[in-house]
Swiss-Prot record:
InterPro entries: Glu_permease_IIB, PTrfase_EIIB_Cys, PTS_EIIC, PTS_EIIC_1, PTS_IIB_1, PTS_Sugar-Specific_Components. GO terms for molecular function: kinase activity; protein-N(PI)-phosphohistidine-sugar phosphotransferase activity; protein-phosphocysteine-N-acetylmuramate phosphotransferase system transporter activity. The EIIB domain is phosphorylated by phospho-EIIA on a cysteinyl or histidyl residue, depending on the transported sugar. Then, it transfers the phosphoryl group to the sugar substrate concomitantly with the sugar uptake processed by the EIIC domain. It is an enzyme of class 2 (transferase). The chain crosses the membrane at residues 124-144, 158-178, 181-201, 218-238, 261-281, 302-322, 335-355, 369-389, 394-414, 441-461. One of its GO terms (cellular component) is plasma membrane. This is PTS system N-acetylmuramic acid-specific EIIBC component. Its EC number is 2.7.1.192. The lineage of its organism: Bacteria, Pseudomonadati, Pseudomonadota, Gammaproteobacteria, Enterobacterales. It catalyses: N-acetyl-beta-D-muramate(out) + N(pros)-phospho-L-histidyl-[protein] = N-acetyl-beta-D-muramate 6-phosphate(in) + L-histidyl-[protein].
Amino acid sequence: MAKEISSELLNTILTRVGGPGNIASCGNCMTRLRLGVHDSSLVDPDIKTLEGVKGVILTSDQVQVVFGPGKAHRAAKAMSELLGEAPVQDAAEIAAQNKRQLKARQTSGVQQFLAKFATIFTPLIPGFIAAGLLLGIATLIATVMHVTADAQGTLPDALNFMKVFSKGLFTFLVILVGYNAAQAFGGTGVNGAIIAALFLLGYNPTATTGYYAGFHDFFGLPIDPRGNIIGVLIAAWACARIECMVRRFMPDDLDMLLTSLITLLITATLAYLIIMPLGGWLFEGMSWLFMHLNSNPLGCAVLAGLFLIAVVFGVHQGFIPVYLALMDSQGFNSLFPILSMAGAGQVGAALALYWRAQPHSALRSQVRGAIIPGLLGVGEPLIYGVTLPRMKPFVTACLGGAAGGLFIGLIAWWGLPMGLNSAFGPSGLVALPLMTSAQGILPAMAVYAGGILVAWVSGFIFTTLFGCRNVNLD
């Protein structure tokens, strides 16, 4: 398919989802065009057969069309332009569609909630990947070249320059999250950013680092700015809800002057008194749970084995707050490489299908087109084009991923926990230089590479033995 998404393809998709009048919203994540629909019964599931479409996920109120990285953003932009030219519906049609949309929302509340995480974090993912890659490459060069932290010269300066982006991102990440979260929950982004900044300020007048807020208690009550990303998400949600309530009774002439002012005062009070302590407890509980799962080999196997299923249902974005919590508590994201084993297991399954298929079959052509993205960590083409339509290979791919997760869990259990140097990043082979551990980058890279190899081989063996029986290999 060409680099640009053809208007003919988008018009065909638009027709098969029920036309412009059936579209409630248009957006994208890293690999998918996401179309909110009023009536899912009007959607033709054969969209997945269109040339250039790598897969389709249907929910009660959304159609997710898999295009791949980069293409999804261009598709969403072009689709928005097409929808902007669509005729306006009359009030009766809009009312009827809103009723159907409300009903759909009531039947998929969990998916609707998790979809918010995609809205909040997807715009940040390119930055996570770029900063993480720069940090990983700089760390690898420093390790190989034996560059110490206090070294002087052109090379150390260049390496420090490459690392500064990661420091900047994670120092002020909560402000970006607060802005996006407030918007996602229906509020004003800058209000969420201001509230998030309260979690960054220091409240100890004797501290020598950070930014002192100017007071150390809240009307005599101690301030404990814990919770980080969890607290910020709760505070941003509260900020958006309060803003909506204030705006209901605020006269239009005073809206710009007073709505945000009142919203910030109320939300900040709640943040200092309730949200910061609550966020801290939730943050500690979540970190404890996943740190113990990560150090439990069986827990790692279960997480890796189920992750492909989470991707299929579109709820994998719900892990991002966990990634951020682990970054704060461990200094690296130990969950991400475990979940990445799911994609590696699928690569092994696809190679087994390729080996068992006829030389000139369509299956071999499908695998050839999807295997390189799979090796580089983009799994949707393999999921929706190769394994999931045949079901058994999808199950054996999950088992292969579980084997890779078990391997990483065993190594962590034996004393070498490792993880991604960023909250989010690429998976597959591209993620190798982003691995880190207390023992250094090279041992972490070796563990990750070993996990990928185990997942490849296990996925291949499981699929060869159990995933090809009574399966269409044409």
